Amino acid sequence: MEKDVEIGIFGGTGIYDSGLLEDAKEVDIDTPYGKPSDTITVGTFKGRKIAFLPRHGKKHTIPPHMINFKANIWAFKELGVTRIIAPSAVGSLKEELAPGHFVLPTQFLDFTKSRDGSFSEDGRVIHISVADPFCPELQSSITEVTDSLDMNIHKDCTYVCIEGPRFSTKAESKFYRTTGADIIGMTLVPECQLAREAQICYASISTVTDYDVWAEKPVTAKEVLETLSKNVEGTKKILTELIEKIPKDRSCSCAKALEEAEF
């Protein structure tokens, strides 16, 4: 099995293939938590070893509440991944975050209900810190890239994660707005906190597809896909520039996340 992969990319809604990888091959991994969402594509790009996994499966057959997040993170860890970039589709909770805009979340609010969000089991108790859930080093690299590309990306935003797969009611959407959160989606949690437990750096690049339902126009899956199809090239452009900007050595604290987390 490959053990020297540096960077893992989780494909979100609208991004189902790696596209940019050279010498790509499919890797099938079994984990203690079952199978990942699909086979993992491993290849190289600009001299960096990359693993790509669409979290919904290559044919988008896995709804958000049924994603095997633990298997996905474990599989990346098995390959040697130390950094994860996670594109995703989100709804906007604020008028200034318009469809087509990119968002760099720095905090989350967890409204999921039935997801297994920890590797803490079999007598191992982990109280991981997610005070700052995302790797500052990765976020800095993303900001550097989007600034150089003159792309409109909103920073310091809070992501509301809901269970799905249904969209919110109008009452729920208006409630989430009262929390001060900026965007809403279905996949960030527990993905980011499992990455922290695995001591893997993690950052999300979110694409706004709609105004949820607070704006009185109900969101539809068709609307989400139409917006994503227009913006997928923007996401790929960010990834293309980002991969070579990520430092080879880590200077963040993500690699030491368990040192003060276990009893």
From Swiss-Prot:
Q: In which pathway does it act?
A: Amino-acid biosynthesis; L-methionine biosynthesis via salvage pathway; S-methyl-5-thio-alpha-D-ribose 1-phosphate from S-methyl-5'-thioadenosine (phosphorylase route): step 1/1
A Gene Ontology annotation in the biological process aspect, one of them, is: L-methionine salvage from methylthioadenosine
Question: What domain of life does the UniProt record list for this protein's source?
Answer: Archaea
Q: Which residues bind substrate?
A: 186, 210-212
The residues the record assigns to binding phosphate are 13, 55-56, 88-89, 187
EC number(s) given by UniProt: 2.4.2.28
By its UniProt entry, which Pfam families does this protein fall under? Answer: PNP_UDP_1
Recorded hits in CDD domains, A to Z, give: MTAP_SsMTAPII_like_MTIP (cd09010)
Q: What class of enzyme is it?
A: transferase
Q: Which GO terms describe its cellular component?
A: cytosol
Q: Which UniProt keywords apply?
A: Glycosyltransferase, Purine salvage, Transferase
Q: Which reaction does it catalyse?
A: S-methyl-5'-thioadenosine + phosphate = 5-(methylsulfanyl)-alpha-D-ribose 1-phosphate + adenine
Function in brief? Catalyzes the reversible phosphorylation of S-methyl-5'-thioadenosine (MTA) to adenine and 5-methylthioribose-1-phosphate. Involved in the breakdown of MTA, a major by-product of polyamine biosynthesis. Responsible for the first step in the methionine salvage pathway after MTA has been generated from S-adenosylmethionine. Has broad substrate specificity with 6-aminopurine nucleosides as preferred substrates.
NCBIfam families in UniProt:
MTAP, PRK08564.1
State the family it belongs to: Belongs to the PNP/MTAP phosphorylase family. MTAP subfamily.
| PANTHER family on file | S-METHYL-5'-THIOADENOSINE PHOSPHORYLASE (PTHR42679:SF3)
Protein name (Swiss-Prot/TrEMBL): S-methyl-5'-thioadenosine phosphorylase
